């Protein structure tokens, strides 16, 4: 089996996502509340094993020395699961808010104080949703130095993370799809 380098994997991911028409044109409301003339519909793509395989390899190779892989619900959970399986690092799932029943946990999984955590997300615009997950990890004793996103919309998330002292690493940016 041929080992692919990072650039080959990136090209493969662009091709897979382009074939699935993940960038849709029209009028959309984003999770940030903003209007947009395009939408990055990655949810369907991350249900495909071939897509998850490429994503997991790219993130696991770039994550370096971490103790846990985390993903905010719902969109990032399949991504975090794939990276966890590929890297053999335990998984954390971050809820949007605490449950009002059962254990009332915000974080599912075994997060220990001082654990180094790589956080993954499907799409970022401003980075607000992902930063909320990062803060939940930090408030529970985890250390986040790197976060990964499959597609960055290039609307400020990378800079916002930089201000927080965290490196946000987009696997792809929306400009990678502008030819479509």
Swiss-Prot record:
Residues that, per the record, bind 5-phospho-alpha-D-ribose 1-diphosphate: 95-96, 99, 121-129
Annotated catalysed reactions: orotidine 5'-phosphate + diphosphate = orotate + 5-phospho-alpha-D-ribose 1-diphosphate
Entry EC no(s): 2.4.2.10
EC category: transferase
One family name in Pfam for this protein: Pribosyltran
Keyword Signal: no
Binding site for orotate: 125, 153
Example GO biological process: pyrimidine nucleobase biosynthetic process
Cofactor (UniProt): Mg(2+)
Membrane-crossing segments per the record: none
Keywords on record: Glycosyltransferase, Magnesium, Pyrimidine biosynthesis, Transferase
GO molecular function (one): orotate phosphoribosyltransferase activity
Domain of life assignment: Archaea
Matching InterPro entries: OPRT, Or_phspho_trans_dom, PRibTrfase_dom, PRTase-like
SUPFAM superfamilies listed in its UniProt record: PRTase-like (SSF53271)
SUBUNIT field: Homodimer.
NCBIfam families for this protein: pyrE
Family: Belongs to the purine/pyrimidine phosphoribosyltransferase family. PyrE subfamily.
UniProt function note: Catalyzes the transfer of a ribosyl phosphate group from 5-phosphoribose 1-diphosphate to orotate, leading to the formation of orotidine monophosphate (OMP).
Protein name: Orotate phosphoribosyltransferase
UniProt source species: Methanothermobacter thermautotrophicus (strain ATCC 29096 / DSM 1053 / JCM 10044 / NBRC 100330 / Delta H) (Methanobacterium thermoautotrophicum)
Lineage of the organism: Archaea, Methanobacteriati, Methanobacteriota, Methanomada group, Methanobacteria
Gene that encodes the chain: pyrE
């Amino acid at each position: 089996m041929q080992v692919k380098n990072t650039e080959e994997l990136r090209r493969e991911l662009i091709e897979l996502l382009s074939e699935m028409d993940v960038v849709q044109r029209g009028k959309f409301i984003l999770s940030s509340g903003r209007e947009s003339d395009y939408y990055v519909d990655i949810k369907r793509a991350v249900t495909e094993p071939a897509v998850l395989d490429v994503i997991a390899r790219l993130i696991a190779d770039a994550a370096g020395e971490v103790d846990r892989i985390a993903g905010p619900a719902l969109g990032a959970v399949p991504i975090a699961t794939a990276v966890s399986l590929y890297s053999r690092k335990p998984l954390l799932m971050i809820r949007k808010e605490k449950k009002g029943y059962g254990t009332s946990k915000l974080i599912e999984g075994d997060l220990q104080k001082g654990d180094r955590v790589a956080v993954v997300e499907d799409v970022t615009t401003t980075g607000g949703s992902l930063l909320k997950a990062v803060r939940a990890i930090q408030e529970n004793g985890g250390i986040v130095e790197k976060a990964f996103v499959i597609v960055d919309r290039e609307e400020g998330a990378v800079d916002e993370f930089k201000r927080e002292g965290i490196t946000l690493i987009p696997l792809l940016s929306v400009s990678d799809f502008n030819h479509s």
